[in-house]
Swiss-Prot record:
GO MF entries: intramolecular aminotransferase activity; phenylalanine ammonia-lyase activity
Active site: Y80 (proton donor/acceptor)
Role played: Phenylalanine aminomutase that catalyzes the rearrangement of L-phenylalanine to R-beta-phenylalanine. Catalyzes the first committed step in the biosynthesis of the side chain of the alkaloid taxol (paclitaxel), a widely-used compound with antitumor activity. Also has low phenylalanine ammonia-lyase activity.
Catalytic activity: L-phenylalanine = L-beta-phenylalanine; L-phenylalanine = (E)-cinnamate + NH4(+)
Keyword Lyase: yes
Pathway: Alkaloid biosynthesis; taxol biosynthesis; Phenylpropanoid metabolism; trans-cinnamate biosynthesis; trans-cinnamate from L-phenylalanine: step 1/1
Annotated keywords: Alkaloid metabolism, Cytoplasm, Isomerase, Lyase, Phenylalanine catabolism, Phenylpropanoid metabolism, Taxol biosynthesis
Subcellular location as annotated: Cytoplasm
UniProt cross-references to SUPFAM superfamilies, sorted A to Z: L-aspartase-like
Modified residues (2,3-didehydroalanine (Ser)): S176
Name listed for the protein in its UniProt record: Phenylalanine aminomutase (L-beta-phenylalanine forming)
Gene: pam
Entry's EC annotation: 5.4.3.10, 4.3.1.24
Cross-link entry 5-imidazolinone (Ala-Gly), positions: A175-G177
Organism: Taxus canadensis
């Protein structure tokens, strides 16, 4: 088989986006330097990022185009939007060049702010408006829109002064461009008093005052300039850009957390073996499997998992359930969709997307439809479906964590106890996750299938790209809630796994010590130790010596087996063994509960900080997911959840959600993946890399 592995491409691309977002200080706008979704997101969310309009690269072509339009307009040339009416009214003619442009802006300032209605959101976020201003500016640099250089410089100054107009949330069909939202940017430039501008995060003033504060005067629009300002896909593409930045980061986050889920659920890492994916070579599947194989390589939790199953091979099914085992196959189309959507949106970012396109070199205006945002609209629908797929995967994994039958020894609801009759752990999150998942699946329904003819049947097909981008942004917010809940639960599971290991050692030590003190035969001691290791600790933690719970039942059964075994041997008295076993059980009741309670209470108070002198409590220290655990527990100051703790699940999940929403989560993500891109074909400790095994399986 000669398939080629497309190695680490989407991981590399996403890490590149994150680094660009974090490091960019200046965005060059010249029509030749590509602008990525990370650049757009950085400008939207970081006030320290500036825009640099490079005159040397593009001013000449911009001014040549503008001069051509003015000359043709004054000569009475028949050019759409210059000497004609707009849209379905393009059969009208006029020589009132400036008045025509002013009239266009006036009629398009038709959005409505719905303050006082049920929804508290009635305007597009300032982040989207700033991004749209950047993309409109970039579109003009191609020199085929007919706008003056001075207008472009004004946009640059407004952006660098953090001034932008307030824009109503609704009203765009995204063909012919985002007319109504973009009219508010034009309204700011011409100083319309009805347009309100934001200065920074807090100040709101009328457009004329905003211009005055940054040393600008209202523009009197010349031929085509009003049309150039409004007739493009800039708002839809701007919002789609920040959406795609987030979608990429969340995709990589979900992929990575699949590995953490495998650790805490005691899954088998076999699902990521290279040969499985070599014979079904979807690029996204191969890349996801390679990432997960690397994350789980030499995992200390995998060592613990193998030890767990070696005791009793019938403890769980031979194969893990689909939420883990088929995760690379499930992720494959989601990876590809988000990758393709990113490319499509970035193509739109770096385009001239208005009409007509001025071909001044050939002395003509080309009437087309680059304002049609269907590429963005359709891909926003596709991305929303992909986001729903990510959410469904998280929901399935979360459900496995909550159910003791599926979680391989973890307590139901991830409850620490000790009294499970009054400790319901993360049950509330379990319910919330179902609600999140249901709403997310609903949002996966397409927007672009709901097109209506607009503007006197001139815009008889339109993209609805901005609406679709808004809904995708909404879907991503829900996915962030699901990731926050899932990560919180997995940190709880890590604590429970580490505590489980520590408690099993306590039980083994107590059983071994008492067996020696009571003079039990070696074979009897071995039987008892097998039970101590084999019985899941959380099935009896509530009351270790309760005769109705699995530990004591198992020990008693083992003792009975020892008595029977001795009885079958001639010449050996069983009475002495019975007496010794009775003494063993009495001492066990006195000692075991106290020692287990001491360990549990200490861990409940200090969590992983109790790890100084206990190997069992440092299992996470050797995991690649330590950065996530440490970030959640230390940086965000959360703790293991128990009935004794006053903290509610909401308080901890809120901290994690906020860190995802504001981007801080990328810090542990980058630390977690540090070294992945630079892995050689061979690996230390005799473990081969994914690529090495791939090459050998030809």
């Amino acid at each position: 088989m000669g398939f080629a592995v497309e190695s680490r491409s989407h991981v590399k691309d996403i890490l590149g986006l994150i680094n660009t977002f974090n490091e960019v200080k200046k965005i060059t706008v010249d029509g030749t330097t590509p602008i990525t979704v990370a650049h757009v997101a950085a400008l939207a969310r970081r006030h320290d990022v500036k825009v640099a309009l490079e005159a040397e690269q593009c001013r000449a072509r911009v001014e040549t185009c503008s001069s051509w339009v003015q000359r043709k307009a004054e000569d009475g040339a028949d050019i759409y939007g210059v000497t004609t009416g707009f849209g379905a009214c393009s059969s009208r003619r006029t020589n009132q060049l400036s008045e025509l442009q002013e009239s266009l802006i006036r009629c398009l300032l038709a959005g409505v702010f719905t303050k006082g209605c049920a929804s508290s959101v009635d305007e597009l976020p300032a982040t989207a408006t700033r991004s749209a201003m950047l993309l409109r500016l970039n579109s003009f640099t191609y020199g085929c829109s007919g706008i003056r250089w001075e207008v472009m410089e004004a946009l640059e100054k407004l952006l660098n002064s953090n001034v932008s107009p307030k824009v109503p949330l609704r009203g765009s069909v995204s063909a012919s461009g985002d007319l109504i939202p973009l009219a508010y940017i034009a309204g700011l430039l011409i100083g319309k008093p009805s347009v309100v501008a934001r200065i920074g995060d807090d100040v709101e003033v009328p457009a004329p005052e905003a211009l005055s504060r940054v040393g600008l005067r209202p523009f009197k629009l010349q031929a085509k300039e009003g049309l150039a300002l409004v007739n493009g896909t800039s708002f839809a593409t701007a919002l789609a850009s920040t959406v795609m930045y987030d979608a990429n980061v969340l995709l990589l986050l979900v992929e990575t957390l699949c590995g953490m889920f495998c650790e805490v659920i005691f899954g088998r890492e076999e699902f990521a073996h290279p040969l499985i994916h070599k014979v079904k070579p979807h690029p996204g599947q191969i890349e996801s499997a390679e990432l997960l194989e690397w994350l789980l390589r030499s995992s200390p939790f995998q060592d613990l998992s193998r030890e767990y199953y070696s005791i009793d091979k019938l403890k769980k099914p031979k194969q893990d359930r689909y939420a883990l085992r088929s995760s690379p196959q499930w992720l494959a189309p989601l990876v590809q969709t988000i990758r393709d959507a990113t490319t499509t949106v970035e193509t739109e970012v770096n385009s001239a997307n208005d009409n007509p396109i001025i071909d001044h070199a050939n002395d003509r205006a080309l009437h087309g439809a680059n304002f049609q945002g269907s590429a963005v609209g359709f891909y926003m629908d596709y991305v929303r479906i992909a986001v729903a797929g990510l959410g469904k995967l998280l929901f399935a994994q979360f459900t496995e964590l909550m159910i003791e039958y599926y979680s391989n020894g973890l307590p139901g609801n991830l409850s620490l106890g000790p009294d499970l009759s009054v400790d319901y752990g993360l049950k509330g999150l379990d319910i919330a996750m179902a609600a999140y998942s249901s709403e997310l699946q609903y949002l996966a329904n397409p927007v672009t299938t709901h097109v209506h003819s607009a503007e006197q049947h001139n815009q008889d097909i339109n993209s609805l790209a901005l609406i679709s981008a808004r809904k995708t942004e909404e879907a991503l917010d829900i996915l962030k809630l699901m990731i926050a809940s899932h990560l919180t639960a997995m940190c709880q599971a890590v604590d429970l796994r580490q505590l489980e290991e520590a408690l099993v050692k306590v039980v083994e030590n107590v059983v071994s010590t008492l067996a020696d003190e009571c003079g039990l035969p070696n074979d009897t001691k071995a039987r008892l130790l097998y039970v101590a290791k084999a019985v899941p600790v959380y099935t009896y933690l509530e009351s270790p010596c309760d005769p109705t719970l699995p530990l004591l039942l198992g020990l008693e059964q083992s003792c009975f087996g020892s008595i029977l075994a001795l009885h079958k041997k001639d010449g050996i008295e069983t009475d002495t063994l019975v007496d010794r076993l009775a003494e063993f059980e009495k001492r066990l009741s006195d000692r075991l509960e106290n020692e287990m309670t001491a360990v549990r209470v200490l861990y409940e108070k200090k969590g992983h900080k109790t790890a100084d002198n206990n190997d069992a409590l440092v299992r996470i220290q050797g995991s690649r997911f330590l950065p996530f655990y440490r970030f959640v527990r230390e940086e965000l100051d959360t703790g293991v959840m128990s009935a004794r703790r006053e903290q509610t699940p909401q308080e901890d999940v809120q901290k994690v959600f906020d860190a995802i929403a504001d981007g801080r989560i990328t810090v542990p993500l980058l630390h977690c993946l540090q070294g992945f891109l630079g892995q050689p074909n061979g690996c230390a400790n005799g473990v081969e890399s994914f690529q090495s095994v791939w090459n050998k399986s030809a």
